[in-house]
């Protein structure tokens, strides 16, 4: 009887401890500064879903005394939310970082360079079209995006720069582009990204004439934080927690950890096999050192110059912009492309470097 009573008392004590523990945790969460990260479905960004699902993000957020919410958006909506300052950080390409927040005057900082497209984006054709015969033919794509950038780079690298003005572009949403292209055999060319590319080339009459592996490092996938957030002590804790969580997560994805692949694939409604196929054409910077070496290298500036020139030529840097230098970019070595008084996009490798040095 005595042992049973002690058991009941012990159980009650444990229950109270659990309840008080939960209460303390809830109180701590309520008191913690909260930050929100936006992401959209893409091979290099799907791991943010797993990061949250697995508890990896919470573990690092707790270490730094912050609370981090991860919110999924359609890509365009995520950028709009970031520009409107409704979220603190957002996954986006280098081009969108320049022509959305930076062009809107929102000073932004890339703290994680996660990967670059190494074949995920492609120019696909029927009827044996080439870059020489492409001008004048209807080309389906999402205009003013990396798809149009890829198409123009393909034209230039194949000696067709003088024909750029003759391209006949059909603006088509990514939600409609696969069906619109495949269901009408008179459509001869399309530019898009995986997994849409994989769905289209399943039709054996379609093949790729150019993809992003031909322009390595030019289409980068970033985690961008508003600089005003990063300039606060809590914002820096947030950046440290997010960076640490990212590298723990991406190493699990890269090494094929079962749940990491399962949830990363599920994030975009893909099978694990389809997701693995997308990863093959995504140049992931799995180690922080590889990301730091890339970000700190002079090659990044050359690639970003191509992107900013494209954005300026197409009027993507905002109203009243009369020079490509009016929306400037700063780099980790202190170099600035453009007017130093008008820096709107910054590459900051400090957090990746801290991860490399084991200081997070």
Regions found by a protein language model. Give the residues of each.
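Bacterial N-terminal signal peptides that target proteins for export
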Residues: 1-12
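Bacterial N-terminal signal peptides
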Residues: 10-21
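Signal peptide processing junction and immediate N-terminal pro/mature segment
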Residues: 22-29
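Short, glycine-/small- and polar/acidic-enriched structural segments
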Residues: 29-171, 180, 188-194, 217, ...
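Predominant activation on well-ordered alpha-helical scaffold segments within soluble catalytic domains
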Residues: 49, 98, 152, 198, ...
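Pocket-lining segment of extracytoplasmic ligand-binding domains
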Residues: 96, 163-170, 175-272
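Secondary-structure end/capping motifs
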Residues: 231-320
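Conserved C-terminal helix/tail region of periplasmic/extracytoplasmic solute-binding proteins
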Residues: 308-360
């Amino acid at each position: 009887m005595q042992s049973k009573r002690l058991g009941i008392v012990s159980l009650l004590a444990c229950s109270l401890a659990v309840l008080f523990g939960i209460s303390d945790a809830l109180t701590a969460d309520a008191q913690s500064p909260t930050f929100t990260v936006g992401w959209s479905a893409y091979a290099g960004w799907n791991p943010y879903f797993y990061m949250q699902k697995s508890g990896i993000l919470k573990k690092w957020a707790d270490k730094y005394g912050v609370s981090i919410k991860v919110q999924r958006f359609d890509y365009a909506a995520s950028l709009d939310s970031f520009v409107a300052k409704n979220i603190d950080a957002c996954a986006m390409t280098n081009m969108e970082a320049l022509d959305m927040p930076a062009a809107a005057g929102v000073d932004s900082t890339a703290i994680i360079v996660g990967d670059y497209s190494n074949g995920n984006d492609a120019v696909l054709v029927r009827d044996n079209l080439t870059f020489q015969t492409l001008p004048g033919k209807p080309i389906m794509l999402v205009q003013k995006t990396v798809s149009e950038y890829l198409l123009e780079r393909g034209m230039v690298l194949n000696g067709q720069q003088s024909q750029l003005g003759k391209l006949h572009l059909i603006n088509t949403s990514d939600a409609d582009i696969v069906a619109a292209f495949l269901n009408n055999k008179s459509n001869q060319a399309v530019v898009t990204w995986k997994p849409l590319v994989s769905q289209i080339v399943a039709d054996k009459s379609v093949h790729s004439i150019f993809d992003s592996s031909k322009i390595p490092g030019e289409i980068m996938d970033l985690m961008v934080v508003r600089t005003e957030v990063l300039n606060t002590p809590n914002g820096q804790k947030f950046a440290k927690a997010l960076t640490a969580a990212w590298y723990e997560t991406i190493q699990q994805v890269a090494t094929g950890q079962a749940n990491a692949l399962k949830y990363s694939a599920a994030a975009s409604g893909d099978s694990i096999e389809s997701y693995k196929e997308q990863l093959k054409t995504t140049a992931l910077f799995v180690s922080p050192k590889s990301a730091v070496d890339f970000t700190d290298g002079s090659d990044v500036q050359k690639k970003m110059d191509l992107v900013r020139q494209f954005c300026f030529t197409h009027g993507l840097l905002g109203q009243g912009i009369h020079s490509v230098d009016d929306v400037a970019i700063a780099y980790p070595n202190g170099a600035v492309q453009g007017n130093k008084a008008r820096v709107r996009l910054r590459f900051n490798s400090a957090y990746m470097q801290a991860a490399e040095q084991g200081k997070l």
